[in-house]
């Protein structure tokens, strides 16, 4: 089989700072009013009273959705979405295009390495540039799968289990239990600036959910980089009587020594996890060395599927789990091939967590959601990532080449 070359790469955005609030899509933080994801949630900005009530108050939704589409010479296309908005479009159309167009559709690793190497001088340790590279990488995997007629998980070597089981992230673990999920992860609402009173309030929330959910249902806390090691350690011990399964991303990404200390002093049996906002393979290697229990890369932010596979190998070599930050189909196709991912995350994007809304709604069509907390591998048996782009969304292409 002679594989075609890539003819063109195109980039669109939707949502972001210039759009109406609530576009959703690849930037799932961009939700409308009265949504749990924009409630009073602890963040690194919570120490400033002007920005503690809402994550959108400090601009968490200003980037918007980036859509990258790659077209082969035979007319077939692949696409992906992430969070990078209009600035990501510029990077794709004015810089990364030269490494993509003219390459064979199977040259994914070559393109990936060239994109990483060419952006080192302005990418730093991740962020917007890495989000953009991730989106391109995912689009390339989607195109390759469509050209050869295989789902991405089969390109990675095939499934190691028949189904993926999920825990749910949202404000209502009790509802997640009713939907068949194996656990529920809640955001914390208080931080070091709130002192011991904040610890008591979040521990009381865990206690309340433990009473509602029973003893056998997993409960976890997502701290979203909002704490210091002393506060995190005290919170972990305050929640230990309620059988908290893990405490997540307590600290900013680069505080490796503090993660090491937190793991050393955490209650016996409680896992320490992180990785959502780490943006390079090297940062995950260092994070792994701290001894945390689970690494949680976001495939749309860490360098794409190509990097995620490498991160999983690092974790496996140390006996650690890799459970990606919820990324819908882009992580489904990966984790079903990983032996060290026994479960995965589903992010509840319905406003009150009472219904099953696809994570990237409305930008993806045919995006699967768990049924009774699970997705069978047969649901993934479509070429590429198995989803289509909703072109009825307000897509803008601000740059071309």
UniProtKB/Swiss-Prot annotation:
It catalyses: L-rhamnonate = 2-dehydro-3-deoxy-L-rhamnonate + H2O. Mg(2+) binds at residues 222, 248, 276. The record marks 298 as: Increases basicity of active site His. Gene3D superfamilies: Enolase-like C-terminal domain, Enolase-like, N-terminal domain. Substrate binds at residues 29, 55, 345. The keyword Magnesium applies. Keywords: Lyase, Magnesium, Metal-binding. Pfam families: MR_MLE_C, MR_MLE_N. The active site is at 325 (proton acceptor). Its cofactor is Mg(2+). It comes from the Bacteria. The record marks 345 as: Transition state stabilizer. Its EC number is 4.2.1.90. GO terms for molecular function: hydro-lyase activity; identical protein binding; L-rhamnonate dehydratase activity; magnesium ion binding. Binds 1 Mg(2+) ion per subunit. One of its GO terms (biological process) is carbohydrate catabolic process. CDD domains: MR_like_2. Homooctamer; tetramer of dimers. Reaction proceeds via a syn dehydration. Belongs to the mandelate racemase/muconate lactonizing enzyme family. RhamD subfamily. Catalyzes the dehydration of L-rhamnonate to 2-keto-3-deoxy-L-rhamnonate (KDR). Can also dehydrate L-lyxonate, L-mannonate and D-gulonate, although less efficiently, but not 2-keto-4-hydroxyheptane-1,7-dioate. This is L-rhamnonate dehydratase. The gene is rhmD.
């Amino acid at each position: 089989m002679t594989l075609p070359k890539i003819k063109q790469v195109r980039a669109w955005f939707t949502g972001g700072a210039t759009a109406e609030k609530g576009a959703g899509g690849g930037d799932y933080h961009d939700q409308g009013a009265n949504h749990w994801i924009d409630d009073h949630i602890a963040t690194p900005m919570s120490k400033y009273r002007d920005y503690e009530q809402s994550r959108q108050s400090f601009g968490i939704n200003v980037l918007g959705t980036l859509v990258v589409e790659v077209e082969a010479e035979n007319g077939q296309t692949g696409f992906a979405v992430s969070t990078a908005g209009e600035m990501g479009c510029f990077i794709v159309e004015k810089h990364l295009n030269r490494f993509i167009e003219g390459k064979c559709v199977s040259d994914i690793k070559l393109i990936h390495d060239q994109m990483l190497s060419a952006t080192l001088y302005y990418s730093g340790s991740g962020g917007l540039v890495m989000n953009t590279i991730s989106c391109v990488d995912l689009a390339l995997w989607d195109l390759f799968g469509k050209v050869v007629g295989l789902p991405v998980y089969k390109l990675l070597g095939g499934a190691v289990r028949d189904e993926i089981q999920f825990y749910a992230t949202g404000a209502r673990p009790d509802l997640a239990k009713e939907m068949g999920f194996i656990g529920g992860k809640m955001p914390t609402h208080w931080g070091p600036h709130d002192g011991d009173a904040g610890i008591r309030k979040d521990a009381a929330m865990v206690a309340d959910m433990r009473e509602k959910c029973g003893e056998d249902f997993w409960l976890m806390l997502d701290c979203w980089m909002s704490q210091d090691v002393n506060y995190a350690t005290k919170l972990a011990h305050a929640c230990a009587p309620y059988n908290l399964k893990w405490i997540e991303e307590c600290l900013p990404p680069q505080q490796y020594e503090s993660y090491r200390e937190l793991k050393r002093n955490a209650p016996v049996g409680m896992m320490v996890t992180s990785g959502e906002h780490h943006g390079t393979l090297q940062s995950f290697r260092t994070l792994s060395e701290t001894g945390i229990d689970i690494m949680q890369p976001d495939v749309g932010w860490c360098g794409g599927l190509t990097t995620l596979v490498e991160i999983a190998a690092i974790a496996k070599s140390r006996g650690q789990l890799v459970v990606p930050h919820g990324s819908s189909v882009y992580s489904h196709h990966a984790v079903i091939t990983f032996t060290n991912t026994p479960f995965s995350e589903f992010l509840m994007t319905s406003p009150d967590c009472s219904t099953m809304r696809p994570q990237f709604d409305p930008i993806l069509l045919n995006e699967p959601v768990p049924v009774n907390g699970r997705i069978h591998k047969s649901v993934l048996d479509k070429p590429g990532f198995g989803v289509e782009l909703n072109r009825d969304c307000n897509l803008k292409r601000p740059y071309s080449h």
